[in-house]
């Protein structure tokens, strides 16, 4: 078996466990909101910050590929995929691909929300 898959799987298990833990530790009341997904919100922001650090370190070859697979793909992938979304957007902006970046941001948010709504509708009405 290729160890790359093992590293990604182990990191994913750790990241998913961390996401669950952070979600359980956060209150549901936040600022003026009676019910706010603070756990998910926090995980996404933490993941974006950490992938920014790791993305730069990876570009500078501070750590090896196996650790990158374990931590970036595995841990952060299990913790939040929003962090990858943030990194992909930043890379487009750094390459001055502004139309692509705007399309990616708007498309991901709008089509993602539509996908959630369609899935919800189908599950509600047909399952």
Curated annotation (Swiss-Prot):
Q: How does it sit in the membrane?
A: Multi-pass membrane protein
Q: Which GO terms describe its cellular component?
A: plasma membrane
Q: Which residues cross the membrane?
A: 3-23, 38-58, 67-87, 102-122
Enumerate the Gene Ontology biological process terms: cellular detoxification of fluoride
Record field: catalytic activity: fluoride(in) = fluoride(out)
- Keywords in alphabetical order: Cell inner membrane, Cell membrane, Ion channel, Ion transport, Membrane, Metal-binding, Sodium, Transmembrane, Transmembrane helix, Transport
Recorded hits in InterPro entries, A to Z, give:
FluC
Q: Which residues bind Na(+)?
A: 77, 80
Locations listed in the record: Cell inner membrane
**What Pfam family is a match for this entry?**
CRCB
Q: What is stated about the way this protein's activity is regulated?
A: Na(+) is not transported, but it plays an essential structural role and its presence is essential for fluoride channel function.
* Main location class: membrane
- Alphabetized GO MF terms: fluoride channel activity; metal ion binding
What is known about what this protein does? Fluoride-specific ion channel. Important for reducing fluoride concentration in the cell, thus reducing its toxicity.
As for family, the record states: Belongs to the fluoride channel Fluc/FEX (TC 1.A.43) family.
**Name of this protein:** Fluoride-specific ion channel FluC
Which gene name belongs to this protein? Answer: fluC
């Amino acid at each position: 078996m290729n160890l790359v898959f093992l590293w990604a799987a182990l990191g994913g298990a750790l990241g998913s466990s961390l996401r669950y833990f952070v979600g359980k530790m956060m209150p549901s009341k936040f600022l003026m909101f009676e019910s706010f997904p603070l756990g998910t919100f926090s995980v996404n922001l933490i993941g974006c910050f950490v992938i920014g650090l790791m993305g730069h370190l990876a570009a500078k070859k501070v750590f090896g590929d196996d650790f990158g697979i374990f931590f970036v793909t595995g841990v952060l992938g299990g913790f939040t995929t929003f962090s990858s979304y943030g990194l992909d957007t930043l890379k487009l902006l750094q390459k001055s691909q502004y139309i692509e970046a705007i399309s990616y941001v708007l498309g991901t948010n709008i089509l993602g929300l539509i996908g959630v709504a369609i899935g919800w509708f189908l599950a509600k009405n047909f399952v």
